[in-house]
Amino acid sequence: MKRTFQPSLLKRKKNHGFRLRMATKSGRKILSHRRRKNRCKLTVSDK
């Protein structure tokens, strides 16, 4: 049986990347909350 998690960096960035977060109001809200919490990585596209 094939496992459900088949990791792909491209798909990951397309769905949870910085550009996508900035594109929507709720995404920007997520970023602001993560900035307020002083997260090292805001999105998955951060290294």
UniProtKB/Swiss-Prot annotation:
GO cellular component, as recorded: ribonucleoprotein complex; ribosome
The GO annotation for biological process reads: translation
Gene Ontology terms for molecular function: structural constituent of ribosome
Gene3D superfamilies assigned: 1.10.287.3980
UniProt-listed Pfam families: Ribosomal_L34
Keywords (alphabetical) are: Ribonucleoprotein, Ribosomal protein
Does the record's keyword annotation contain Metal-binding? no
Q: Give the domain of life.
A: Bacteria
Asked if the Swiss-Prot or TrEMBL record annotates the protein with the keyword ATP-binding, the reply is no
Signal peptide extent: none
According to its UniProt record, which protein family does this protein belong to?
A: Belongs to the bacterial ribosomal protein bL34 family.
Q: What is this protein called?
A: Large ribosomal subunit protein bL34
The species is: Wigglesworthia glossinidia brevipalpis
